[in-house]
Amino acid sequence: VLRIPFMCNLGTKEGVSVTDGRFSKVWPANRSFFQALRSRGGLIGVAVDPLTSHECGNQRYLAIPWLDVCLAARLPNEIGEPLKPMPDRDVWLSDPTGKEAVAASEFEGKKLEAGWLPNGEIAIHWMEYVTDTGVPDVTAPPAPLEVTLDGKRLTWRANADPESGLSQFKI
């Protein structure tokens, strides 16, 4: 379990900045889980959504790239082979409820009390997310396929990637 990457994602109003009320025990429970794993070298981070409580906010903006990086690192080359271990060459660390992350080699605190981030790319997304949840998507959506003009009728087939989606068309 300690070698499996985890990310705890909760809203700030779940006991981080609001410490009473219906969801105030979410952060203490997450903190206990985080500390139990991280103190033993577990690969676990915390991403606090600064805008929400218990509802689903913009978590996907961090979750999708985080999962992409972790899956790309762990999936085997051949079907049936075991999962690969997470690489540790570009790990970044953060205060679990903070807003800044640094390369592990530059981290000055207690590393086994710090939030774990798999690499610099995710650390940048994490810092954007915990600041205002505004993780920009820098990937272009796939180009349309089977574009056909029949008289005045233009048709095409489009595939949306999970990160970019399709917010608009420009013709």
Q: Predicted segments — roles?
A:
Residues 9, 35-142:
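C-terminal catalytic histidine-bearing segment of alpha/beta-hydrolase fold enzymes
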Residues 12, 50, 160:
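Residue-level signal for short, function-critical loop segments
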Residues 22-33, 63-65:
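Well-ordered, non-membrane alpha-helical segments in soluble/globular domains
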Residues 169-171:
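Short beta-strand elements bearing conserved aromatic residues within extracellular beta-rich modules
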Residues 128-166:
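Pro/Thr/Ser/Gly-rich low-complexity, intrinsically disordered linker/stalk tracts
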Residues 12-24, 53-54:
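Acidic catalytic loop of the alpha/beta-hydrolase fold
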Residues 1-4:
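Primarily recognizes the serine-hydrolase "nucleophile elbow" in alpha/beta-hydrolase
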